[in-house]
Regions:
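Type III/flagellar secretion export determinants
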Residues: 1-129
Length: 129
């Protein structure tokens, strides 16, 4: 591991609703902006991680960032699933009707998540379009 800290920091911990919402809003904005693609050149995710890290005690920064990253992946997966459900032929990079994402809410995504070891996974998801 490049940090020299092993993987013990890869554990789930509580992350404030404020930062989960900031990450959700960013994922949604960038999902729309990039038509479902992830663009490492334009993303603002690092700013959210940095702000989060500065808001918590030093001993919680690594595990909190790990957890926030788990949420980020699940938010993106839910948006992908919603667009695919409405348009089965859609592929990332193609334009889509952004109103599809109006029904994807952070709370509804989080209500489907369960802990699986040190990861958050979807138990099930119901996307109404």
């Amino acid at each position: 591991d490049v940090t020299g800290k092993g993987t013990s920091w890869q554990q789930l911990t509580s992350v404030s609703e404020e930062y989960r919402q900031k990450m959700f809003d960013n994922v949604k904005k960038e999902f729309i902006q990039e038509n479902g693609l992830s663009n490492g050149d334009t993303t603002k995710r690092s700013d959210i991680f940095k702000d989060y890290q500065l808001s918590v005690n030093k001993d919680k920064r690594l595990s909190g960032t790990w957890t926030l990253e788990q949420y980020e992946g699940q938010y993106r997966a839910a948006m992908y699933a919603a667009v695919k459900s409405a348009n089965p032929n859609w592929k990332p990079g193609q334009k889509f009707d952004t109103s599809i994402l109006d029904n994807v809410k952070r709370e509804s995504v989080e209500s489907t998540l369960v802990k699986n070891g040190n990861r958050l996974v979807r138990n099930s998801i119901d996307v109404s379009v």
